[in-house]
């Protein structure tokens, strides 16, 4: 594990804003309806937001308020947050974001999950939280740029939790994270004691009952 703190050169931000300023929205885009892709007005709003309203400095400061680390395994360098609850009865919980998405989705939940009592959530279970960025999202990347499928990502997160010393834990996944959480539970049901999904992955051909026993159980 490596400790991590995000430090961005201001020139990188200046260059990004310059590129946004030099962006040109083609005139005929204004004739498109939403079924043909992004509309002119929507794209203009996004460009203006990124140039004049979004503050990476503020977001980076918020990110750095949490404990961040790098986990390196077999050419995969995964950025993750690890926030421990002050409560002794806390249970470990892995939170997995979707795509497009990021670990920023969970920031508002962190104090509620790690210290519910002090946030007016009396009687709620506290958690020690692990929040990884998916491969090639944010500060996570492959050192050799080798693509990963969902099973490989799931196994990588199982290894991450094992290296953090968690023998038993819970997993929450949304969007793409739902698939990863489901695979983790299937591949290591001994360690993964329960999962919570924002999206329910369903097999293809749901109307047909599988012939094999494993398929019937999944159905």
Task: Identify the function of each model-found stretch.
Residues 1-25:
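Mature N-terminal segment immediately following signal peptide/propeptide cleavage
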Residues 4, 24-25, 41-219:
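Catalytic cores of eukaryotic secretory-pathway lumenal/extracellular enzymes that build
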Residues 8-11, 38, 148:
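Short coil/turn linker and secondary-structure boundary residues
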Residues 30-40:
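Coupling/switch/interface segments within P-loop NTPase motor domains and analogous charged loops
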């Amino acid at each position: 594990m490596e400790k991590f703190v995000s430090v961005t050169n201001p020139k990188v931000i200046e260059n990004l804003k310059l590129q946004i300023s030099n962006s040109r929205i083609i005139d005929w885009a204004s004739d498109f309806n939403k079924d043909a892709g992004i509309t002119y007005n929507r794209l203009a709003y996004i460009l203006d937001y990124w140039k004049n309203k979004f503050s990476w400095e503020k977001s980076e400061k918020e990110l750095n308020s949490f404990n961040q680390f790098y986990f390196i395994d077999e050419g995969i360098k995964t950025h993750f947050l690890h926030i421990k609850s002050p409560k002794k009865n806390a249970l470990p919980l892995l939170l997995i974001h979707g795509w497009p998405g990021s670990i920023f989705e969970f920031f508002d939940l962190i104090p509620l999950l790690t210290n519910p009592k002090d946030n007016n959530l009396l009687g709620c279970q506290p958690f020690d939280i692990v929040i990884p960025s998916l491969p090639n999202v944010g500060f996570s990347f492959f050192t050799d740029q080798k693509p990963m499928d969902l099973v490989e990502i799931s196994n990588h997160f199982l290894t991450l939790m094992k290296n953090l010393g968690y023998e038993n834990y819970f997993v929450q996944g949304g969007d793409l994270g739902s698939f990863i959480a489901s695979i983790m539970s299937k591949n290591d049901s001994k360690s993964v004691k329960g999962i919570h999904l924002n999206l329910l992955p369903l097999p293809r051909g749901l109307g047909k009952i599988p012939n094999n026993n494993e398929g019937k159980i999944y159905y």
